[in-house]
Amino acid sequence: MSLIEFLFGRKQKTATVARDRLQIIIAQERAQEGQAPDYLPTLRKELMEVLSKYVNVSLDNIRISQEKQDGMDVLELNITLPEQKKV
């Protein structure tokens, strides 16, 4: 062991770091199964604000739903757009 390795330690290989991070993510997802993500209400609100900023649409015409399909969370966004005026 060289003096530099002793003082600063060895760097972990990127594959090891990536594996450790993935294991943490998987453990968190398993712990949260059956729960809606805590960011979902904020995400819904912000999506509605952005959509209403760029498209003249009523908030009543925007539907956001979250469900599980095949073990994955699916966020579905349905917007009823107003008809465009023909020139």
Swiss-Prot record:
Swiss-Prot/TrEMBL GO biological process terms: division septum site selection; regulation of division septum assembly
Keyword Cell division: yes
Function: Prevents the cell division inhibition by proteins MinC and MinD at internal division sites while permitting inhibition at polar sites. This ensures cell division at the proper site by restricting the formation of a division septum at the midpoint of the long axis of the cell.
InterPro entries: MinE, MinE_sf
Keywords: Cell cycle, Cell division
Protein family according to the UniProt entry: Belongs to the MinE family.
Organism of origin: Neisseria meningitidis serogroup B (strain ATCC BAA-335 / MC58)
Protein name: Cell division topological specificity factor
Keyword Lipid metabolism carried by entry: no
GO cellular component: plasma membrane
Gene expressing this chain: minE
